[in-house]
Amino acid sequence: MEGGCSFAQNLRFGEGREASRRPPVMETLEIIDPTLSTGNDGGEWLLIHPTQRTMGFREVLLGAPAYSPGHGIYNAVRATSTVIRQVQASVLRNILDGVAFEDLADDWRAHISARGFAPGDLAEKYWLEPADAVRVAENATETWSFLLRNLLLDFVRRVAEYCIDGMGGADGTAAYARYVDWLTCLGIVPVIREGDVADDSAGKGTERFVADTEWDLSMQNRLRLAPAITRRGYDMLGCLERCFRAARVMNYDRTVVIMHSATRELRAYDVHTRERGGCVVAWDPMLTERGIVFDSPMQRLYAAVLRTQAVREHAKLCQLANTAPVSVLVARREDKVAADPAGVSKLVDKALGEGAEEAGQSAAAKLIKFIIDMQNMRKVGDVAEVVDAYLRESGGPAIDKTFSLDPGRAGFGGNGKSAQGLLGQQGQPNQPKDGVASVMRDAVNTSVGKVVNNLFKAVSDLKSANADLTRRNAHIAKELTESRRRIGALTSAAARDNSNGSSRYDAPDAWRVLDEKDARWEMGDTLLSLGNLPESVTMNKVDLSGEMTEDQYVANSFFSRYVPPYLEEESRLSALWERELLRVFKMHRVTNNQGDEVSISYSNSSISLIVGPFFHRVLKATRLGFLVADDEAYKSEEELCESLFKKSRVDAYLRDLKTTYLADVRNACAIRKIRQEPFLREPQDVSGEFERAGVGADYIDGAETAPWPGDDTRKKWDLANRGLCRGGPARQRVEWERGEDHGQLGERDVRRSVPRWWRTTPYPTREDQRSGRGRRGMRQLR
C-alpha cells in the first residue's frame, strides 16, 4: 500500500520537477508499462487525465466551487433508479418467458382437482343454478392466478434484488454513477475487464442466492412449473453476476488516462493497483495545438462556472469590505521647505502674526522676512532692491531721525537763536546718515551672504540625496519586476511540462483570492470573516499626499459601497446548466398545469443514449432484452411488476385457461340439467294431440318398432318420440315419420335443433332394450 501511495504522489501534476524534463507521470507509467517507450510510430503518449482542468471538472460536478439551481438537473441524470428498473424488468421478462403452457395447465388441473372444482364436480353441486357455478369457477381462477402471480413476482423480485446488490457493490463491480461522471466530464469511460469469470465463482453466488431465498424444494414439488422458473432465475442471476464481475468502471480520482498522438489509442491505469484498462469512447476528444479538447458537457460549462465563481467571490469581498461603519479619506500637502520658500514665508507669517500691525512692530519678523526675500532672489540685481526695501521698512525711521540739540538749555552754552539756526539747517544733507547706511549695508550683505550660502548648500545636499534614493528605488523596482517575470515563466513551464501542453486551457482556481482560499472568511460569520481579511482591504484608508501639489486640495470624497451583480451571473449559469444537460442527455421536464417544474425524468432517448451503452458496451450484458420504457422507469416496484406481468405470456396462458374452464363448467351444468330435469316434471296427457296429428297408437306403444340405438333411424325416432311424449309439433313429427332426411346430426347439434322442452326427455338405452323395458317402460317411469 505504501508503494501505491508513493506512486500516486509521483503522478500529482509533476510538482517540483524541472520544465525541461519529461512529465513525471509518463516516466512513472513507463516503469509500469514498458510498451509506452517502444513502438511510438512517430507519435508520443499524451496525458489527458489527471490535469488541473480535468480534476476541476469533477469538483464542479460535486458543487465544490459553485452551485446553481440548474446544477440540480445533473442529480437526475446521475440517479440509478432507471438502471434498477431496467434490471428488474429484464429479469422479470426473462424468467416469465420460460413458463411452458403444458406445465401451467397441469398445475391448474391439479389445483382444481385438489379443491374439488372440476367442471363435473361443480355441475353436480350447482346444476340447479348454473350462474352460481360460473361465479365459483371465476373466483377459483382469479384466486389461483393471483396467488401464482404473487409467487412468481416474489421470486423474480428476489432475483432482481440480488442482481442490483451485486451491481452497486464497491468491491470491483461496475457503478452507474461513476459511469455518468466520466461521461459528463470527458466523454470517455475507463473500464477494467477481468475476463470471463470462472463458473465456480458464479456457482458460489447462486448457492448464496438459494440460501437467501425461500424458493425451496417443497415449492418445486408442489408446482410443475417451478423447476423451469428456478432454472431460468439461476441462469439469469449467473449471467448478470458474470457481467458485473467482469467489468469495473475505474474511480475518477485514482485513474490516469493517456492517448497516443498518432494512433489515438487510449489507455487507463489505476494508480493504486497499477492495473491497466481500456476506454469506452462516447464522444471523441480533439487534439489541438493548445492541448486536448473534450467533447463533453463539462468542457463547455467549465469556463462559465469559473467566471461566475469569480464574480460571486468578488461580491463577497465587497460585502465584507463595505461592512466597516466608517471609511475615511486622508490627504495632506508635503512639507517642501527648500523647494518652495513661498510656503515657508506663509508659515513664518502665520507663526509670527499675520496682521500688518504685528508684522511692523516685530523686528524679528522683519529680519526673517528679509532673509526669506533674499532666498527668493532670482538674480543678483535683486539684492539691492531687497536690502533697500528692508532698510526703508526697518531702518529708515531710525536713520532719518534728526537729533535736535537745544543750545539754549543748560550745559550747551547757546541761546534760542542758535537753536532756531540749527533747526533751520534741517533741510541740508545729513552726513552721518549716509555713513550709518553704508555700514549697515555692508554688515547685512555679509550676514545675508552667509545665510544664503548655507541655504543653497542644504538644498543642493537634499537634491543629491533625493536623486540617489530615486535611482536606487528604480533599480530595486526593476529587479523585482524581473524576478516576478522569471517566477511566472518557471511556473508556466512547469505547468506545460506537467500537462504536456493541455494546461494552456487550465484556468487558475477561481476561489484563490488573496493567494489562498480561507474557509474562515468564505461564508462564515461576518464580523469574524471581516477580522480575518487583510488590513488593506478593511481599513479603506487612501493616502493622496504624494499626488498633491501646492495648488491641490481635497474638495470632496465619495465612498461607493459597490457589490457586483452576481445574481445575474448565477441566473445565466443556471440556465446554461439546464440547457446543456437537458439537450445533451435528452432529459424530459415534467410540469404541472401551471407550468411549474415537477421533476426531471429520463425519456426514451435518454435511456437509449445512457442506459443502453452502459449495459451493452460497458457490462456486455446481452440477455437484457428490450430497454425499459420511460413510463415504466418511474413506476413503483409493484406497479412495474403488474404492468410487465400483464404483457407476459403467463398472463395470456392464464386467460386461456380461464376461458376454457368457464366454458367447461357451463357445458357440464347444461348436461347435468338435461339429465335431471325430467324427474322434476309432472307427466302430461298428449293423446288428443296424437289423434290430431294422425299418428297411430302402434307408433306410440310399439316397443318392437323402436330402432336400435346408434343409427340415424334411432335419432329420428328419438326426436319423434320426444315430440309425441311432450306434445311437440305434429307437422314436424309427420315429416320425421315419412323419413325425410335432415342431415347427419351430432349429439350437440341434435340437442340444439329442437326446442328446449324437447331436450329434457330421456330415451331408452341399450340396457332398456335388452331388459324389455322399451318405450312402454320409460313411460311407466315417467
From Swiss-Prot:
Basic residues bias (residue ranges): 772-782
Basic and acidic residues composition-biased segments: 735-752
InterPro entries the UniProt entry points to: Herpes_Portal (IPR002660)
A cellular component term, taken from the record's GO annotations: virion component
Region (Disordered): 735-782
GO biological process terms on file: chromosome organization
Location in the cell: Virion; Host nucleus
Region of interest: Putative leucine zipper motif: 448-469
Keyword Nucleus belongs to the record: no
Pfam families reported in the protein's UniProt record: Herpes_UL6
Broad class of where this protein is predominantly found: virion
Keywords, sorted A to Z: Disulfide bond, Host nucleus, Viral genome packaging, Viral release from host cell, Virion
Keyword Oxidoreductase: no
Family the UniProt entry places it in: Belongs to the herpesviridae portal protein family.
HAMAP family, alphabetized: HSV_PORTL (MF_04012)
Its biological purpose: Forms a portal in the viral capsid through which viral DNA is translocated during DNA packaging. Assembles as a dodecamer at a single fivefold axe of the T=16 icosahedric capsid. Binds to the molecular motor that translocates the viral DNA, termed terminase.
Subunit and interaction comment: Homododecamerizes. Interacts with terminase subunits TRM1 and TRM3.
Protein name: Portal protein
